[in-house]
Amino acid sequence: MIGAGFALAQAVDPRIQQYDKGPATINVSGYPAAAQQDYAVFTQKCSQCHKLSRPINSDFALPDEWSRYVHRMMSKPGSGVDSSSGLKIYDFLVYDSSVRKKAMVDAKLAKASPAEKAAAEAKIKQVHDKYGHQ
């Protein structure tokens, strides 16, 4: 049994292992109250299946990347992430990336097509508007 767990641990993508080694919390004290509430949903739901450090330190930053990630988690059996909590998690991750990972967002947007950039910026603005943050 121990060997099976060891083999499973070895099968984890090295990139993901690197994310898992980073910080597992975010200081959201300066975030809008609604973002702080969504962070609580993120921490409660996402920690059931994996370390919080994984999404916190990942190279996902754009809204479409977070949308794919959250939908993948929602489809996992027993995840407990329904559409309501999934939207809160998505909104938080998009907002957090636009603040904490701004340089990464900017670098990715610089490589995007004009249409992709406009779509991503509109989604980021929508989340900022929801949270009442400019």
Task: Spell out what each predicted region is.
Residues I2-A9:
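Sec/Tat signal peptide C-region and signal peptidase I cleavage site
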Residues A40-L52, S67-H71, S75-K76, L87-D91:
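C-type cytochrome heme c attachment motif
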Residues G5, S75, S98-K102:
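A generic secondary-structure boundary signal that marks alpha-helix termini
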Residues Q10-A33, T43, S83-Q134:
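Flexible coil segments in periplasmic/lumen-exposed cytochrome c-class electron-transfer proteins
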Residues M1, L62-E65:
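Short, solvent-exposed linear motifs at loop/edge-of-secondary-structure regions
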Residues A33-A61, S79, D96-K101:
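Periplasmic/extracellular electron-transfer cofactor-ligation site
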